[in-house]
Amino acid sequence: MEQANEKEEEERHEEAAGEKESFEESKEKAAEMSRKEKRKAMKKLKRKQVRKEIAAKEREEAKAKLNDPAEQERLKAIEEEDARRREKELKDFEESERAWREAMEIKRKKEEEEEAKREEEERRWKDLEELRKLEASGNDECGEDEDGEYEYIEEGPPEIIFQGNEIILKKNKVRVPKKSVVQVDGHESSNAEFVLQISDRPTSNPLPPGSEASANYQNVSSAQQILESVAQEVPNFGTEQDKAHCPFHLKTGACRFGQRCSRVHFYPNKSCTLLMKNMYNGPGITWEQDEGLEYTDEEAELCYEEFYEDVHTEFLKYGELVNFKVCRNGSFHLKGNVYVHYRSLESAILAYQSINGRYFAGKQVNCEFVNISRWKVAICGEYMKSRLKTCSRGSACNFIHCFRNPGGDYEWADHDRPPPRFWIHKMTSLFGYSDEKHMEHESSGSLNDSISDLSTDSHRQPSRRSRSRDHDHANVGSTPSYRSRKYHGDTQDSTREDKLRRHAENCHDGDDSPSRDGSLEREMYKERRYAKDTLHRDSRWSEHSPGHRVGRKRIHGRYSDDDSADGDDYGRRGTGHKRKPRRGTDSGVQEQMDNEKDRKTHRSSRKHSREGSSADKEEGHEHDRVHTVSDKSHRERSKHRHERSSSRYSHEEDSTESRHHQHKESDKKRSVETSPVGYQSDKDRDRSKQRQRYKSDDPESDQSRKGKRQSEENSDRETHKERRHRHRKRRRTQNSDDQNPKESEEVEEEIERWRPV
């Protein structure tokens, strides 16, 4: 301490001495410098002196702080905090380093395990390759005897190996001794060899079509029995949870994977449903490109109606149908598929034998049996809810998107519902039997009417026209198609007027002309669906390919596109249901109706002639004689026309025509016909008008003239209708004759009164 103080004192003395020297020097300089320079030097010295003082003061304060105990404690605490922070950072670093080392160790172990597995797989693969080479070359160590005693079979599921962009399926094979095969002479030995041959085949789709496995398997049992047995064994059979069986093939009979599907497909040897793949290729199908823009919706619907008329009529020859559907999906496995569901298995087999291998529109038709019995499951539900418009899955939907059949045919089958009553009657008139299960649901009154109708229809003569045209006449109970609504407006207007007129007459006098069964659906399906008298097309069915030239009259005696006098094959082939002969003929019924009409006409004409003068009476007698001659000629013409129409119209048209005739009979009773049915010439027409012109001007004569005009219009309209509706029912005619016995007596009295003396 003393030495330090001495040093400080020495420094002070030196500084003081230095200051004195500098002061003296400054004075000397000041003496030499000017006033301004002196002032600057003084200021500089003062600033320097101030800085020195401040520095000295700071040094003293620092010494004081160092000597202060509180300050020393604060500095010590700061140092300790820094030490703790450095220690914590070091521990964190060591912990993270240890975790990283552990992770790297785990990763290294995994890589080693993968490498070991890869080496093991390569080693096993090499062993298998060596075994295959040894088997192929026959140079196995065990010799020929050992090779003949052992074989390699698959064990467990195959292993999937991913090598770059390749996927390799490796099957584990185990070497086992071969089973001893007992050689037996005959067919059993071939079956045993066949079982050994197919043992190594893939089991994903064991029954592809056309294979020998399918042929042998079909001989064992039917497909329905197999499905029932499998459905009992598998809990979720036919659903998405069932990974063994293809649900789409079970529901629709088609799968987009085809034979490459990993799930089992069932191919029955016989079934009630036939499938013709890609048969329809007309407009209306969903296309991948823009081909669909070339046709409008109306043109597509018209083309499908033509296809439906041709194909549906051909399939209906072989038996009653439950459903007829054509797919309009865009997927290849469903595009243009035609499904035909028969009610009986015999009809389906007959259709298969007749249609398979034939040509339609230049393309060979291939029929398949499919197990489709629930159409509600096969058809897309969302597509049905949208009324056959669209689906959220679009054209790639794996369920059926079907066309709407003309007239709404088979819409009830889409929901697995029974057919309506009118359809049962229609099928009864076609095939001679009815579905008793559906007829039980009818009421007792309608049931009696239907039974009486069936008894009458059962005696109809078989049709002699081609079934392809004859079926359209049987479709009287269906609603008009789009083509008849669009291209045959006149026919539609006339039928609409007749329906309105009959409805008004029924409202005024319902006792004389009641409806047949009073059902709404019968009223909806009263008119013709197809206008066959205005549109005739040739069928596109043929027995040979387009290049084969064959006449169109008869093709192998199986099917003819044109009409023939001998009838079609359906009448010769039959459906197993024979009809009884009729108790009466249509010509006799027609004569009775004409006689009734003549009596009414004579009564009305003589009633008007009684009101005239004697000259008018003579003229009326002359007109009556002319009218009698015209009536005879008219009866002859109607009889001849009936004989021709009996060969043109089928028996199924009679039931519907009788309902039309019922309204015509009521028209004849309510309106007195004062004019004859036909005139011999224009001169007779003028004479009758002149005779009516000179009658008395009383109100009764005016009313009679009005009634005459109305009856003329009704008779003209009925005559126009009778050209197409010539058949009458015997029981309807008998009822009309027996309804009012007093009326016949009045007619006889009028004849006796006005008979010339």
Swiss-Prot record:
GO CC terms of this entry: U2AF complex
Keyword flag Transferase: no
Pfam family, one: zf-CCCH
Domain called RRM: residue spans: 295-372
Keyword Repeat: yes
Polar residues: compositionally biased ranges: 444-455
Biased segments, Basic residues type: 36-50, 547-557, 600-609, 722-733
GO molecular function list: DNA binding; RNA binding; zinc ion binding
Region of interest (Disordered), residue spans: 1-127, 441-757
One of the protein's GO biological processes: mRNA splicing, via spliceosome
Basic and acidic residues bias locations: 13-35, 51-127, 487-546, 610-634, 644-672, 681-721
PROSITE patterns found in the cross-reference section: RRM, ZF_C3H1
Zinc finger (C3H1-type): 240-268, 374-404
Keywords in alphabetical order: DNA-binding, Metal-binding, Repeat, RNA-binding, Zinc, Zinc-finger
PANTHER family referenced in this protein's UniProt entry, alphabetically: U2 SNRNP AUXILIARY FACTOR, SMALL SUBUNIT
Protein name: Zinc finger CCCH domain-containing protein 5
Lineage, top ranks: Eukaryota, Viridiplantae, Streptophyta, Embryophyta, Tracheophyta
